[in-house]
């Protein structure tokens, strides 16, 4: 069905595509233990899925990606929001409605990026490795609002310029109606003047699955279909890679390495010629860094349990290649960029960046004002630079008011205008101190 589709006519809600893979990414954010993962479970049912196959399991669990199909009942009389239902991504396209038994239509296939602890979250959000189109902000009704991380996450969303947010007031089953009303007022006060100001606020109980159908209706109605350009050169950021061969397999049965990641732009098809950059990085006799891109061909594509003929941006995609499996084993390719041959951006060893520092450290509570303030960049200090899904060290060579020159410890495939996150080592932890835009850099001859 998908082979003879015309790429220019595809859209992220084309039935042939959403029946097999997710096309919209939604992040779940909020304070610790406010129920982010529980909401994802309530919508996608994913914690109950025992994957048929280790492959997908490796990919989806570590990062907390879960896909869900959202259906709407075809019967006009069926009362909303009960006419919306969600199932896991291997459900058929027209299941019967549980209320009136009419067939339901698949309207969206979404992928939830379930963000873990906030420090990591900040880096992933800024990295754009989680290409989020929208966010669910969770606020628990049985604690006062705002909790410290709730406000940081809002700051992070503002940096990322995410416009579409749905606020979920969780755990309403634990509080009285009057308390819920007061808490609702405190949420309104908290979001005033931020990006989330006019966002809908839905009272829910993720454990009891109360009002989950209302969230689905908002996801379908409030979150616009992201504009995706399927005609540009494809690019995928690798976040997992592995060797799928069992020890002792026959030589003829060996399979190539598998890379998993999210596609940023374009479309990947079976049998495409691809290139992976920076590839194999070595040093020559003079100590200069060389890199050798890896060339290969796509032999399989899959999303959760579904084999694909073509893969579009959204959710996590596994790409089976002809690459030597030892190059892929145990996440060796993480942070590399995969794309069509000859169309990938340059590999840089030095970056000139235009940087912005946060006013104070996030997530550090301390009585002393000075410790939480972010100090200016110093010459020769070593920062951690997150580019896409690569984390590499960077030594600050030169600093001006808002510009800095950074020498990377490992070459990175990036392009001018890309956003990177900067972290500094504070009390034995890497802490996010700001973000930057790549202005120019020194490229490696590949």
UniProtKB/Swiss-Prot annotation:
Residues 58-62 are annotated as: G2. Pfam families: eIF2_C, GTP_EFTU, GTP_EFTU_D2. Residues 205-207 are annotated as: G5. Keywords: Cytoplasm, GTP-binding, Hydrolase, Initiation factor, Nucleotide-binding, Protein biosynthesis. Gene3D superfamilies: P-loop containing nucleotide triphosphate hydrolases, Translation factors. Signal peptide: none annotated. Its EC number is 3.6.5.3. As a subunit of eukaryotic initiation factor 2 eIF2, involved in the early steps of protein synthesis. In the presence of GTP, eIF-2 forms a ternary complex with initiator tRNA Met-tRNAi and then recruits the 40S ribosomal complex and initiation factors eIF-1, eIF-1A and eIF-3 to form the 43S pre-initiation complex (43S PIC), a step that determines the rate of protein translation. The 43S PIC binds to mRNA and scans downstream to the initiation codon, where it forms a 48S initiation complex by codon-anticodon base pairing. Belongs to the TRAFAC class translation factor GTPase superfamily. Classic translation factor GTPase family. EIF2G subfamily. Eukaryotic translation initiation factor 2 eIF2 is a heterotrimeric complex composed of an alpha, a beta and a gamma subunit. The factors eIF-1, eIF-2, eIF-3, TIF5/eIF-5 and methionyl-tRNAi form a multifactor complex (MFC) that may bind to the 40S ribosome. Interacts with cdc123; the interaction is direct. This is Eukaryotic translation initiation factor 2 subunit gamma. It comes from Schizosaccharomyces pombe (strain 972 / ATCC 24843). The lineage of its organism: Eukaryota, Fungi, Dikarya, Ascomycota, Taphrinomycotina.
